[in-house]
């Protein structure tokens, strides 16, 4: 497992429960473009899963619009949460 940098650590720590991108923008100490880039990296590593709202219920999404990160919610996976303990 790769080591998390400080921004990635903050992102995963904020995503114990499903949260929108705006919550990350408030809680993580970085600019929105940096948060978005690090979030995309965490998604690629399967440390974070993408969730979409389908008729009022959050469901796992197998794709996301990287140009519109606010359209989805995000949650740390068990693999991502394990990274907090390293």
Where are these regions (language model features)?
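Generic detector of short alpha-helix boundary/capping microenvironments
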Residues: 12-13, 34, 64, 68
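Short amphipathic alpha-helical interface segments
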Residues: 2-30, 37
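Low-complexity, flexible helical/coil segments
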Residues: 8-12, 48-52, 84-86
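Short, amphipathic alpha-helical interaction segments positioned at domain boundaries
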Residues: 60-86
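Short amphipathic alpha-helical interaction segments
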Residues: 29-45, 49-55, 69-71
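N-terminal leader segment of winged-helix/HTH proteins
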Residues: 1, 44-45, 63-67
